[in-house]
């Protein structure tokens, strides 16, 4: 925590003195406006893909705790349906998938299966400042483990699926068993020093393991390694709740199994705008929504 504060003070001082910008300047773009009102159903003409999709059961899992919608990325999504823009943009490409939300309140949305959690875990740790984030992350892991689908995908509600390349996510999961998105945070040392809600990495890696993001995450029903990994994530989150990326590294170290890393194109966050070949945008970051002309 002290390291995080020191780093943030140094960064703020550099910006104040004009030695550093808060983020790199982006070139002017000319993307067409996209919003939830101009979505049109998509039907692929790829027969091989159609056969693969029709022969596979797919479930998308959301985890929403606390009735007040709070977005850590900074966007104001309170006027949106609780699971949008993720839900609507996913349905454009996966109209026949199953959609499930884990929640501690009566979150009723048409076409979405509610799994209300009457007695959530971590009740002895409710005083922690990011308690609801810990709950949400725990049930993202848990939801995939409880899914009966061939492919289960946990995803945050503030994502915008941009194009049909999202189907690659299914093939990658089928091939590698379980996937998590890449992160711009570099090593675990950098993550611990610069992020909120972290805990020390004390294993022999000395913090030089790679860090990951948390949306989207995937699991194939056939992957025993994936199940082992996410079970360990649940176990560690219950025992020592902290930022999900920290939990996931500790789970990987203790279990000895590691997921396939999705490229940043599957979770374009603040600072990665304009990288090219984008698939899913993290529009909970206002700069991402603005860059790609997403109106939410």
Language-model-derived ranges and their functions:
Residues 195-208:
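Short, flexible, basic/aromatic active-site loop/helix in glycosyltransferases
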Residues 163-195:
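Conserved donor-nucleotide/metal-binding helix-loop-beta segment in metal-dependent transferases, i.e.
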Residues 82-85, 122-155, 163-167, 212, ...:
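A conserved donor-nucleotide-binding helix/loop in the catalytic core
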Residues 123-131, 187-193, 291-292:
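Short, charged, surface-exposed secondary-structure boundary motifs
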Residues 93-94, 147-148, 173-174, 255-256:
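A structural signal for short coil/turn segments at secondary-structure junctions
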Residues 207-293:
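Catalytic core and acceptor-binding pocket of nucleotide-sugar-dependent glycosyltransferases
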Residues 5-126, 282-296:
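N-terminal anchoring/stem segment of glycosyltransferases
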Residues 100-103, 153-156, 161, 178-181, ...:
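A structural signal for short, well-ordered beta-strand segments and their strand-loop junctions
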